[in-house]
Amino acid sequence: DRLRSRGLGDVYKRQEKETGTVLDEMQKKAITEAADHGLFILTGGPGTGKTTTINAIIRFFEGEGAEIRLAAPTGRAAKRMTETTGYEAQTIHRLLELNGMPEEERDGHSAKFERNAQNPLEADVIIIDEMSMVDIHLMHSLLLAVVAGTRLILVGDENQLPSVGPVSYTHLRAHETGAYL
């Protein structure tokens, strides 16, 4: 796989050198899993190392020349993601290019996302943080806009704020996939 060509060992060393943070075995396993699989779920409580792990994942894919997109369900979460990664993040709605035309111009149609199956997102890797706040409808729209071959990394804490709409991703059983910090 072209994204694994440089090896993960370099990422671990670079992480230590640039941040002074030594990755533990669970974090290394998470990075390997994210590099190996098209869909990866990273979940864990506060202080478990999710941010450090995500930063190392970003470093790995950056080193491979991958186009990376970061997003979160709210502006506040996206801003925090930008601050902690140093990489620009945006809301999922903005990532999917919500067409917010005024109601009188919609001709009976609701607002829609410009990015979808016919006009997919262009990225090698998409990382979504605060997944516990994403409802099933937004998740469906996101999945429609992701093409085969794009790695989708979902990050969250199932014990944090629930989604505002119906059902959230936390019903996925991340602990059964081995994708748990």
Where are these regions (language model features)?
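Conserved alpha-helical scaffold flanking the Walker A/P-loop in AAA+ ATPase domains
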Residues: 106-120
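Conserved glycine(s) of the Walker
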Residues: 49
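Pre-Walker A segment
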Residues: 5-6, 10-45
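Short beta-to-alpha loop/turn elements within the nucleotide-binding domains of ABC transporters
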Residues: 90
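Single conserved hydrophobic/aromatic residue that forms the stacking wall/gate
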Residues: 2-12, 171, 178-181
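Conserved helicase motor core of SF1/SF2 NTP-dependent helicases
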Residues: 60, 64-66, 72-80, 84, ...
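Hydrophobic positions on the alpha1 helix immediately C-terminal to the Walker A/P-loop
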Residues: 53
